[in-house]
Amino acid sequence: MARYRGPVGKVSRRLGIGITDKGQRILAKRPFPPGQHGPSARRRQVSDYGLQLLEKQKARYVYGVLERQFRRIFEKAQRFPGETGAYLFILLERRLDNVVYRLGFATTRAQARQLVSHGHITVNGRKTNIPSYTVRVGETIAVRPESRRRTYFKNLIDSGALARHKTPDWLRLNPADLSGEVVAMPRREDAEPGINEQLIVEFYSR
């Protein structure tokens, strides 16, 4: 299955959660499922399985992860002691593409994934082009010196967008040199809200 590249508004309305900032804005304006019935449409009663599937799909679309990758991340989370659902989201937050997004180097996770894949990002000074790379405490994530000359990255600094960007507590941003450091492990509450991780655990425990 390919990564979703269709209208983010439509899928956000179908899932009932904004999968990007744009999706959130569209959902706020039209908080009902897509289709001909419009605002009068009600979300259908769904089975327990349907609810579990919906929560899994929410997480997959928000973080931009394919089904096979998502299942591998879940299986890795199962090996940790404690709550599997919480560790699932901690692992999703530690993905390099997500960290690039959280640091404000990209406006969406899809764009962050592209920046990583195209070789614009380094981890501890070494070019890393694997979006699924799991960051560790103490690592420095930065834009490659060769890439900083590009108009896009110059505008990030000149516009003041990075200086205004609010990063989560587990990351420390240095806007001047387009770098950031992982200073702590993310917590479940640092991850995307509005997703019930317990239903995801139940989905894979069937």
UniProtKB/Swiss-Prot annotation:
* Listed SMART domains: Ribosomal_S4, S4
Q: Which SUPFAM superfamilies match?
A: Alpha-L RNA-binding motif
CDD domains from the UniProt entry = S4
Which keywords label this protein? Ribonucleoprotein, Ribosomal protein, RNA-binding, rRNA-binding
Q: What's an example Gene Ontology biological process for this entry?
A: translation
Keyword match RNA-binding: yes
**Residues in S4 RNA-binding domain copies:** 94-157
Intrachain disulfide bonds: none
Q: Name one GO cellular component term.
A: small ribosomal subunit
The Gene Ontology terms for molecular function here are:
rRNA binding; structural constituent of ribosome
Q: Does the keyword Calcium apply?
A: no
The record describes its quaternary structure and partners as: Part of the 30S ribosomal subunit. Contacts protein S5. The interaction surface between S4 and S5 is involved in control of translational fidelity.
**UniProt-listed HAMAP family:** Ribosomal_uS4_B (MF_01306_B)
- Name the family: Belongs to the universal ribosomal protein uS4 family.
Q: What does this protein do?
A: One of the primary rRNA binding proteins, it binds directly to 16S rRNA where it nucleates assembly of the body of the 30S subunit. With S5 and S12 plays an important role in translational accuracy.
Name of protein: Small ribosomal subunit protein uS4
